[in-house]
Amino acid sequence: MNYMHLGRAGTGKTTQLIERVIDQLTEQPLGPSIYFIVPDQMSFEMERRIATDPRLSGLVRMEVMSLRRFAFHMIRDYGNQVIPFLDETGTQLLLRQVVEEAEEELKIFKRTKNMPGFYKGLDELIASFKRSLVNPDMLRQISGASPERSPKLNDLALIYERFTERISDKALHADDYFTTLIELLPKADLSDVSVFVDGFYEFSLQEQQVLLRLMELTKDMHLSFTLDVEDVYTKQSEFGVSQRCYMQLIEQMKERQIAHEDIYYGQTVKFQSTGLRMLEQALLSPGYPPTDEEVTGVTVSAAVNRQVETEAAVRKAIQLVRHDGYRFKDIAFLVRHLEPYADHLERAFQLYDIPYFLDQRESMVHHPIVELVHAVLEIVMTGYREESVFRLLKTELIPLPAEDPRLALDRLETFVLERGIKGSMWKKPWQLKRRLADEISLTDAELQEELELNEWRQFLVEAIEPLEKRFKASKTMSEYTRALYRFLEEHHMTDRLTVWKQQALEVNELSQAREHDQVYEAVLLLFEQLEAAAPEATLTTELFVQMVETGLESLRFSLVPPSLDQVIATDYVRGRLQQVKVVFLLGANDGLIPLVEDQSKLLSEGDHDFLHDQGIPVGKASLDVFDDELYYLYQGVTAPSESLHISYALVDEDGKALQPASIVKQIKHQLLQDRPVKTYFAEAGDHAPDDQLQFVTSPERAAAAAAIELRRLQRRYPIQPSWFDVYNRLLENGRGRERMALFSNALFYQNQAEPLPEDLARNLYGDTIKASVSRFETYNACSYKHFARYGLRLKERKLYKFEAPDIGNLFHGALNDLSMNIKASGKRWRELDDQSCSNLAKEAVEKVTPEIQNAILMSSNRFGYIKKKLTDVVEQTAKMLVKQAERSEFEPDLFEISFGNAMFPPLRFTLPDGTEIEFTGRIDRVDQATIGDQLYVRIVDYKSSAKELDFAEIYYGLAIQMLLYLKTVVEQSEVLFNQQAKPAGALYFHVKNPMMRGDLSADEIERNQLLLESYQMQGVIVENDEVLRAMDQIAYDERKKSPLVKVTFTKTGLHKSHTKGVVKEEELTALMDHAWDELKTSSQSMYAGDIAIDPFDYQERTPCTFCEYRSVCQFDQSLGNDYRQLNPLSEKEVLERLKEETE
């Protein structure tokens, strides 16, 4: 006999079915089989519930299983042969192959086949066809009824048909199990078998056929449906999906003359609170009258965001367990869609130390062995790209042959990134090379490094080359799969994962150990699915790789069944909760409840409606979607027996405002008299006084909350006196005291770098400093940056990139080489013509190019183009230098001269503690001019970007290099020129190829004048009439504005407002002496251990803007850091201050 158990939620249907099972088991412990069929996620708890009943001593004749598991069980026992099972992954792999082969015949899906999720959507759609008993011919027959949908339906019919043909007898699709089961059931003797079916919201047409066949063959069968007994046979019922399913079954039972008996459950027995009883009646009845009674068991609250919402619910759960006698297993957290809340739930459970079961299967995609397979396939397909190579090596499943494999990997990666090694370069020996200008041989240590790098290179190539060769020889799916499997076995993946598993067990990381156990088995199962899908199919390497990657992305870790005392977190459509007393329903926001989502990635809402109109019930008609969502919600809110706590967030993770779901408004109106809801905030002090101590759930959380409140007090905000009691209690508890100190230190932390002890500073910097001026400028810009760079010696990893410093190096190298060639030829700059400049420039660039960033400008056509543009810049610059030389008495004489060696000694001084300071450097160019009997010198610094000499920056020690270089040349002039020289100035020259704008009608002379002016040098010049004349004879004689330097001559002298940087000789000396004093001052501070985080702020410019150490110093104005404000100073103000300081 067949029994239909019908009733609303909470009327005792499940309990009655269990009781009937227990009665049969107690009467006949060893009788005929009993199958209790439930949804998969309900099977473990149902079996535990029956097995732990004290009336039973065992479950010999009863099995609890899902319908799919029941099908597998029957096919295994009564099928004639073992057919490979094609799971979701195998199905998607086979579908990809079918689509690729049929690509030219497809109209719509030809364009969309490479979109993310396409094959998953196609798999779901074909599964839906099978569950709805739809075949390809049915799709073709209805395609004519809708011309606009005809191409899509024909594409689907073609793919579905080819897929069915391909799978045929070779493998069994997941949704073919039920078809096979129906054929096999008569072979099993089920005449004395009892079947109980419970917990399902709906059955597909395919599943209904299984149930009908069981009704015909078994002794008795019991099915439960959640319905209102008063309108069981009403076509339009509030119970949507369940009602439709029941009616479909009844109609088919009548057609097949299957007798049944309806058993009605009208009395609600589950709910222990007035609120839940009323909610069960009101939810599906919007017209349910509001109550004036004070209801219990139902609450609604809001929270500022999802994290706060989740933590508030978790704190409430802790209170229930600690103070109200509940156990964790009595509590569940429900959402409609788990993804927005999964991370928040997991974090909160771990934070508050709550045992939990999160009903979400994690992807395997980030496990090292999956990464390894991805990486090695990328290498085979695209060559030895650095991303693929190091993606493979960083899995540590194929460690480098070195004493410390991780250090070896870091060194190898550093070398590869710096040299831009890729592709075939991995298969050729590597050489460590110096700059071409450096003829020093490699040291023994460098030779050893070269040897080790080549050993690691060869190891990697030898590991991958066999797979490359096997792939080239492979043609079929089976050959490719076995080649990949052989690669994994050759590198002992099983052994390595076994070691990792054991290491995880030793530190009690059980979940990690389980992952290592599952993942290799899952990868091998994927290979089996590939072979099962199309073992002898011919395919390209590219297609095979795509299929493997599709499969890898679908791998998921299996869920561990919940323990005896854990809270459960799941979505209320998937979850099947039993004997739960309290439910926290999170995310009651519009858009999540009801959930607005596409049923299929491939069919639109209109497509679904069309199919339903044509009698093909694939998916759901749009009119049914909302009703079914409401029914799912009904199942969720009726899951608890004692209380339901609904909450929603006010904003999402992006700060976007969220609205409460319509259910919130309905419940507030019908049950809660529209009272305002309580809102939860992130900090305790934002709550009402009585609610603040809810944050005191453990010493850790209490300490965190108390520390925040104490910080409020520090900022002069009032706090509740109870927090002083919490603070004192924490100090009495060892664990609490430790946590309080930790949180207090964090909250009151000031990001300040304490001075180094002087002996430590000396150990870091040495007894003698031999350094460039730029090092001291760095110290004056920010002493902590200096400490990071020169004390800790932190460096960014060098990359094979062409950046601004490389451009500067090329300009400096080319101009130096060009200048030296001119000097060696015996010619003067002014004697060169344009063609000579072009030739010399090209030769210079060609010479220095191999020295720049590992010859990057020779690596590709793109960089070849960049090299040509840079050559143009050098050519144009050389021509302008000739034009400048024609107007000036200053002759370029020395180029790229380095001081700080035996030929050109450095300037040095001794600190009071005996520390020797020597400063070194390289001067781009020194010009000289003899005026009368006196030699004058000026220095010129080439810049690849515009630069002016700011007197205020000189005063603050930020731009002292040029002045110190000039001082050095003057003081060493006897060595350099065999006579004492006087300073004429220090100038910046901008190397560029300017885009000239102006009057197109201007003649060539005007255009040349404008071009020359664009190269005007900026800096400081001594105010001496003869020197100024030597700077630009033509402008001086014509009493005009000079295009060479920032000077304008008038009949009476200089035009002050159009002249910049011109100072008296004593003022220039004062500037040089001040730069020298700044050098001494910064040296003393450096050795005193001053490493303060004190970047300057000068005219909205700070050294932090492009600082590579920002992540080290953690500069943050909210943590006590601030900029050292430097006030702008004019040239006059600086010179006056220097004068005052020397008097």
From Swiss-Prot:
Cofactor binding, note field: Binds 1 [4Fe-4S] cluster.
Record Pfam families: ADDB_N, PDDEXK_1
Q: What processes in GO biological process is this protein linked to?
A: double-strand break repair via homologous recombination
Would I find Protein biosynthesis among this entry's keywords?
no
Has keyword DNA-binding?
yes
Q: Where is the UvrD-like helicase ATP-binding domain?
A: 1-274
Q: Which cysteines are joined by disulfide bonds?
A: none
Cofactor(s) listed in the protein's UniProt record = Mg(2+); [4Fe-4S] cluster
* GO MF, one example: ATP binding
Q: Which residues bind ATP?
A: G7, R8, A9, G10, T11, G12, K13, T14
Q: Which domain of life is it from?
A: Bacteria
Q: Tell me the ranges covered by the UvrD-like helicase C-terminal domain, including all copies.
A: 267-565
Q: Which UniProt keywords apply?
A: 4Fe-4S, ATP-binding, DNA damage, DNA repair, DNA-binding, Exonuclease, Helicase, Hydrolase, Iron, Iron-sulfur, Metal-binding, Nuclease, Nucleotide-binding
Positions contributing to [4Fe-4S] cluster binding: C782, C1104, C1107, C1113
User: Which EC number(s) are documented for this chain?
Assistant: 3.1.-.-
Q: Which family does it belong to?
A: Belongs to the helicase family. AddB/RexB type 1 subfamily.
- Report the function annotation for this chain: The heterodimer acts as both an ATP-dependent DNA helicase and an ATP-dependent, dual-direction single-stranded exonuclease. Recognizes the chi site generating a DNA molecule suitable for the initiation of homologous recombination. The AddB subunit has 5' -> 3' nuclease activity but not helicase activity.
Q: What else is known?
A: Despite having conserved helicase domains, this subunit does not have helicase activity.
Question: What subunit structure does UniProt give?
Answer: Heterodimer of AddA and AddB.
- Its recorded name reads ATP-dependent helicase/deoxyribonuclease subunit B
State the organism of origin.
Exiguobacterium sibiricum (strain DSM 17290 / CCUG 55495 / CIP 109462 / JCM 13490 / 255-15)
